[in-house]
């Protein structure tokens, strides 16, 4: 709710037309009820799009293993460390973990294969499946109209997190690298790269 409030303060009170979950980590879906009303999703007014097997992996990783992972996350991300005039110790992905309410609305539309397309509010999206990378169910998306490539959490401005201390599933670096290469081959004309946790990369050479 705070994030969309910040957006609307600068861009106007624009309605949410769709929700896309890129992968199964709670920091990428847990704020959904602050953005849309579940009743609107259930009524078919707002689609919620996610990669195949999203719910299975979201439940297994965040519910079944959740209590243990939450405890270990305090060691991985350091949310209890003090802040000071020179800043704070963090994990690189962000300054700290969220302490807000987590929520989840089940997807209404699953992306099943690389190359699947959806038109959302008149804008075309092309999806690329990237399972068993930074998350067990993950996908990238490309918006041709803006030449913008969204790599979910698979291309951020830090070292890839292959072995999470909190106990999330170990990542496959070979698969991860193959999906990055495939994205470059599929969407080589991209001019903007979005990595979600960090600032965009602008210009084809930087992408």
Give the label of every model feature segment.
Residues 1-15, 139-143, 147-153:
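Conserved beta-strand hairpin/beta-sheet module of binuclear metal-dependent hydrolase folds
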Residues 2-47, 188:
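Active-site metal-binding motif and surrounding structural segment of the metallo-beta-lactamase
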Residues 23, 48, 111, 141, ...:
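Divalent metal-coordination and catalytic microenvironments
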Residues 24-30, 55-57, 134-135, 156-160, ...:
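Active-site environment of divalent metal-dependent phosphoester hydrolases
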Residues 30-34, 58-64, 69-70, 160-163, ...:
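Short acidic, glycine/serine/threonine-rich loops at helix termini
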Residues 49, 55-131, 175-179:
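Metallo-beta-lactamase
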Residues 128-139, 170-174:
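Active-site glycine- and acidic-residue-rich loops that bind
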Residues 142, 148-149, 158, 170, ...:
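Divalent-metal (often Zn2+) His-rich catalytic cores of metallo-beta-lactamase-fold enzymes
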């Amino acid at each position: 709710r705070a994030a969309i409030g910040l957006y609307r303060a600068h861009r106007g009170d624009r309605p949410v037309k769709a929700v896309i979950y890129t992968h199964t980590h709670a920091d990428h879906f847990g704020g959904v009820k602050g953005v849309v009303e579940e009743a609107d999703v259930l009524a078919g007014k707002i689609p919620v799009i996610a990669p195949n097997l999203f719910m299975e992996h979201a439940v297994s990783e965040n519910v079944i293993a959740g209590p243990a992972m939450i405890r270990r996350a305090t060691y991985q991300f350091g949310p209890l460390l003090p802040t000071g005039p020179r800043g704070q110790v963090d994990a690189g992905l962000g300054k700290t973990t969220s302490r807000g309410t987590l929520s989840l609305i089940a997807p209404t539309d699953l992306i099943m294969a690389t190359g699947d397309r959806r038109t959302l509010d008149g804008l075309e999206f092309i999806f690329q499946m990237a399972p068993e990378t930074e998350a067990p169910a993950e996908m990238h998306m490309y918006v041709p109209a803006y030449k913008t490539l969204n790599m979910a959490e698979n291309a951020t401005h830090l070292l890839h997190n292959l072995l999470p201390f909190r106990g999330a599933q170990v990542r496959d670096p070979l698969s991860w690298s193959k999906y990055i290469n495939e994205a470059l081959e599929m969407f080589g004309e991209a001019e903007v790269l979005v990595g979600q946790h960090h600032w965009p990369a602008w210009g084809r050479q930087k992408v």
